[in-house]
Amino acid sequence: MHSIIPIYQVYLLAELNYKRFMYKKLCILLIFSKLKVAKLLIDKYRMHNLYAIFAKLLNICKQIAGNLVNESGNVPRRGVVPKFSDLEVVALNMASEAVGIDSESLLFANLQEYRVEIPNLISRRQYNDRRKITSSLCNAIRERMVAKMDGGEDYFCIDSKPIEVCRIARSKRCSMGKKDFSKAPGVGYCASQSMYYYGYKLHAVCGLSGVIHSFDLTKASVHDIHYLKDVKVDYSNCTVIGDRGYISAQVQLDLFETANIRLEVPYRCNQKEWKPTFPAFAKARKRIETLFSQLCDQFMIIRNYAKDTDGLFARIIGKISALTILQYINYKNEKPIGRVKYALF
């Protein structure tokens, strides 16, 4: 005979099963709630880093700027004095590029969390306009940092980097340079990548320590050797190391006679009076190639969101200035200058 379970025991078993089910459900909800809180804390910590980086770079800019700005941090000019100073615009530009935020939409979406810390924050449109206006101030601050880090350099490396604006098939629809043809992009050829591109060419001169001393943007169709005309104006009594794109006996002689600049380039294999390349020069020239790799990797210099030429120039200045200020932080902390990814940690 089967034993008959009393009705109260059935109710007890049902209640026990229900409590077990609710206990498991509460445990699962508790786990998900902890994960959600942890995610919010991680986002807040990341944004706190952005504000801390902005404050740190602003302090450095104030120390370096000196007489470039007045007491309020603005370039002296007529009109209403902006509450969000020019130095703050420059520091915000450098901070966004240093952490890899090159989209203004993403930057201002993140900055909404810091309305209390940055009460005078301007709008996105105002920031876009003032970043173009303050690009000369940003470059002047960069040059002062370069002078402190690498002022007595006698050996320099020179090279160029293609900056593509759009594909060649879309070049006729590109709006850049429509108002001023002298600033318009052009079609050029990149020998290292074996391709034609539509855009500009970034020319740069850096020291052996890896600090960019000067740079300029030209049409992609301009040959590398023409930038040496600007080099002989800004430099003298030094040695410039380049690649085979700068081979020209006439230019070498002109640089030496006018500014006492010794241009060292490797010989072509089929060139008359061929001589082997000095190993130290070949190794030193790789430093500027490493700089271009850092600009492409960490600062995304080849990614273009600008719609006009002035905007592109301002972006390039901001990215190179962000690279320089990270090098300056390493220099002050007595760390290797080239390790820019570790400068803020």
Task: Give the location of each predicted region.
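Short alpha-helical elements
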Residues: 2-345
